[in-house]
Each structure stands twice: as structure tokens, then as C-alpha cells.
């Protein structure tokens, strides 16, 4: 038996195979935009690349968390601007109700609007952002980076009945009413305190936004 061997043809075929593999790899690199297509391209480089890719994904998620937290805080402040306007009008009504030339009927008319504004503020206190309460006694915790470090936002509790911190005494009809000059005077005191408390809360929200944007 005679076995014919064409070395030139075999060498050419081998070279063609190498060229085809290199072309396939080059096309894969072009299509993926990655220098490392297979582990054998650069085993150590692949390990480093995988770590970076995972960290980038976590960073992206953390940035998304921060953006949502800022939107949450801005929504809080938007509602609190409306509360500020309502409290200003309530304060005006309490002063009008203390006018000695006003009759009980006049005060009753003022009370209708006053009560509506109380209900308006009370309703705002129940608002939520994607089902997360906007106003509560506990600050929300936000993951702010890829290493899972967190930042606890300042709590904003408008429903607190504590006179020095909340607004409830201003929008609760049992503690603030303007049917008489005496009750109107007491209501005005509650509203003045609530206006200051609201300003403090908005300052806390501003601090939250500032920290989240750092």
C-alpha cells in the first residue's frame, strides 16, 4: 500500500484553519466590543473584567436608587409647599375670627373654610410615592454606592401630635377651631408653631437632597 502525502496541501489547509479561527475571533470581538471573547484569550484579564462589570452594574443600580430618593424628597417638598400655603390662609382666618366686630355667623363661615384646609393638610399626610409613605416618623434608608453603604434620610412626620415637631395640632379640629375669639387665639398659636415646624421639616428635606446629590 502506498500512502501519498502532500505536505504543501496539509500546510495550506492548516494555515487556512488558523486564518478562519482568527477571523471568527476578530468578528466576535468586533460584534461584542470586547477584547476577551473566550477565557483562553486572557484568563486573568477576564477575571478582572468580570469584577469591573459587576461593580459597574452595582454602581448603576445605586445611581438609580439615588435618583429615586431625590424624586421622593422633591415630591415631599412639593406637597409641603402646598401645606405652607394652606397654613398661611388658616393663620389669616384665625386673625379674622378674633375681630370683635364679627358675629358668630361670620365666624361660622370662616370655620367652614378653616375646616376644609385642615382636612386638606390631613389628607396630604397620607400621600405616598410608589406606595411608600411620604410622611412618617422613621427615615428611609438609601443604598448609595456599589459597596452597599447606606444613608438614612431625615424623617418628616407631619402627623406628629408633638407640638414642637409636628403639624397635627394645627389640623386637628379638637385642638384648633375658630368658632370663638378664644378658640381662634389658641388656634393661631398652634398654626404659628406648625408653620415653624414645617419650615424645619423642609430644611431637613433640603439636607436630604443635598446629601443624595453629593
What are these regions (language model features)?
Residues 1-9, 35-38, 50, 54, ...:
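Amphipathic alpha-helical coiled-coil/heptad-repeat segments
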Residues 4-24, 28:
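Donor-binding/catalytic cores of nucleotide-activated saccharide
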Residues 14, 213-214:
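Alpha-helical transmembrane segments of multi-pass integral membrane proteins
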Residues 15-24, 50-64:
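Parallel, heptad-repeat alpha-helical coiled-coil signal-transduction segments
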Residues 28-29, 35:
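Amphipathic helical oligomerization segments
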Amino acid at each position: 500500500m502506498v500512502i501519498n502525502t502532500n505536505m504543501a496541501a496539509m500546510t495550506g489547509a492548516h494555515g487556512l484553519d488558523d486564518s478562519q479561527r482568527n477571523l471568527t475571533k476578530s468578528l466576535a470581538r468586533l460584534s461584542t466590543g470586547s477584547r476577551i471573547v473566550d477565557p483562553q484569550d486572557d484568563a486573568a484579564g477576564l477575571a478582572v473584567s468580570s469584577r469591573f462589570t459587576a461593580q459597574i452594574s452595582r454602581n448603576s443600580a445605586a445611581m438609580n436608587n439615588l435618583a429615586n430618593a431625590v424624586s421622593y424628597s422633591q415630591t415631599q417638598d412639593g406637597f409641603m409647599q402646598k401645606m405652607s400655603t394652606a397654613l398661611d390662609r388658616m393663620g389669616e382666618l384665625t386673625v379674622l375670627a378674633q375681630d370683635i366686630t364679627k358675629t358668630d355667623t361670620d365666624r361660622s363661615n370662616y370655620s367652614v373654610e378653616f375646616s376644609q384646609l385642615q382636612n386638606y393638610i390631613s389628607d396630604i399626610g397620607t400621600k405616598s410615592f410608589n406606595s411608600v409613605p411620604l410622611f412618617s416618623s422613621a427615615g428611609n434608608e438609601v443604598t448609595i454606592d456599589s459597596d452597599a453603604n447606606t444613608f438614612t434620610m431625615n424623617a418628616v412626620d407631619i402627623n406628629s401630635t408633638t407640638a414642637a415637631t409636628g403639624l397635627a395640632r394645627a389640623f386637628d379640629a379638637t385642638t384648633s377651631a375658630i368658632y370663638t375669639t378664644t378658640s381662634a387665639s389658641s388656634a393661631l398659636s398652634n398654626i404659628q408653631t406648625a408653620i415653624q415646624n414645617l419650615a424645619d421639616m423642609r430644611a431637613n428635606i433640603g439636607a436630604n437632597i443635598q446629601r443624595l446629590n453629593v
